[in-house]
Regions:
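GH16 jelly-roll
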Residues: 111-358
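Solvent-exposed, low-complexity, repeat-rich "mucin-like" stalks and linkers
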Residues: 26-55
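Bacterial Sec-dependent N-terminal signal peptides
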Residues: 4-31, 102-120
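A short beta-strand micro-motif common to beta-rich folds, especially ectodomain repeats
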Residues: 86-98
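Short, surface-exposed loop/turn segments at beta-strand-coil junctions that are enriched for proline
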Residues: 80-86
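Short strand-edge motifs at loop-to-beta-strand transitions and within beta-strands
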Residues: 41, 73-77, 269, 281
Length: 358
């Protein structure tokens, strides 16, 4: 039956019934290799079709078509600067009728800047806060919670802006600024997470921070486990905390089932950092399977060894993510009350850098 049908169709065909042949597309290059700095490239296009156009896959690519006529012209490709330390790729598709021709675009990774780190460590992630006006949503996540969510703190954490339009986070003059302010009777502030879904396991992590002033402030640079289930069993690492009621005294703490402040077994240390609320100072952690050490301006703040006592004492062999926040009041920040006349206040961060062993 199929053979007969094919024979009848074949016998009844004529030249006028032949399908229109697919258009042929030619381009003078089928690949673009761009440096991290980016650049502009021109690709010549011709087609036997009646018209042509392009489709772009890659947010770092901008393409414009300059038509000589319906069957020829140039594609102008703009490749944006790559600030990430990863190679990235995109694809430009030229279309004419049912025909397709692709142009592959590959861009080199940005070179890792030379930053000071312990010997044997290399930079794996950083944010210098020198691009744009808001945090990169691919790297950072805002917490959203109402007041008294934790530690009896008085602030409401919101995503970028308060209901009245006040910014709780912004990038300005090369710094991340976390603002805490009062609006319509409520306190608003920011709490942000770096790489909350993947975090890092071990490394040297450093931030440069200028702390806010005022009775009631409670800024922190700390870490929590990616796969969090319960506290303190899963651990908490406080690289730096300060409360405005005790200005310029910064502390580091480790929390676990075997050492927690609720039963006065916490692992913590406090030191005076002159000008912590007036200038930028560095706060860091060097974290391995064997030991955790925190630093203030390169000086050891706290050092704690893995004593081989199990997870109750050392739940720090899992990935943790970085947290920056500015709390107001609460069990510690408001232990002697708060002074709302200090508001608004700002915590400034110059950079966050993560290094791991090569």
């Amino acid at each position: 039956m199929l053979i007969t049908l094919f024979a009848l169709i074949a016998c009844g065909s004529s030249d006028n019934d032949d399908p229109t042949p697919s258009a042929a597309i030619t381009v003078d290059t089928e690949s673009i290799s761009a440096p991290a700095e980016g650049g502009t490239y021109t690709v010549k296009v011709t087609t036997t079709g009646k018209e042509w156009g392009t489709y772009v896959d890659g947010s770092f690519l901008k393409v414009s078509n300059n038509y000589t006529n319906a069957q020829a012209g140039n594609i102008v490709v703009e490749v944006e600067k790559n600030s990430e330390m990863n190679v990235r790729s995109g694809l430009i598709t030229v279309m004419s009728g049912s025909a397709r021709k692709t142009i592959a675009v590959t861009q080199a990774a940005a070179e890792a800047p030379e930053y000071e780190a312990p010997a044997g460590y290399s930079l794996v992630w950083h944010d210098e806060f020198d691009e744009g006006m808001e945090l990169n949503s691919n790297d950072w996540t805002h917490e959203v919670q109402k007041d008294h969510w934790v530690n009896n703190e008085l602030q409401n954490y919101v995503n970028h802006v308060s209901p009245g339009g006040g910014k709780v986070t912004e990038i300005k003059d090369g710094h991340l600024r976390i603002h805490c302010f009062k609006e319509n009777g409520k306190i608003y502030s920011g709490r942000v997470y770096a790489k909350v879904k993947e975090g890092w396991k071990y490394g040297y992590i450093e931030a440069s921070i200028k702390l806010p002033k005022g009775k009631g402030t409670w800024p922190a640079f700390w870490m929590m486990p990616v796969n969090f289930h319960s506290w303190p069993a899963d651990g908490e690492i406080d690289i730096m905390e300060e409360v405005g009621v005790n200005p310029n005294y910064v502390s580091s703490s480790l929390h676990a089932t075997a050492h927690v402040h609720s039963n006065n077994t916490q692992v913590t240390h406090e030191m005076y950092c002159a000008g912590a609320e007036d200038d930028f100072h560095t706060y860091a952690i060097k974290w391995t399977h064997e030991n955790i050490t925190t630093y203030v301006d390169g000086k050891v703040q706290l050092s704690y060894d893995n004593r081989g006592l199990g997870r109750d004492d050392w739940p720090y062999d899992d990935p943790f993510y970085v947290i920056l926040n500015l709390a107001w009041g609460g069990d510690w920040g408001g232990m002697n009350g708060v002074n709302e006349s200090a508001l608004p206040v700002t915590m400034e961060i110059d950079y966050v850098r993560v290094f791991q062993k090569k």
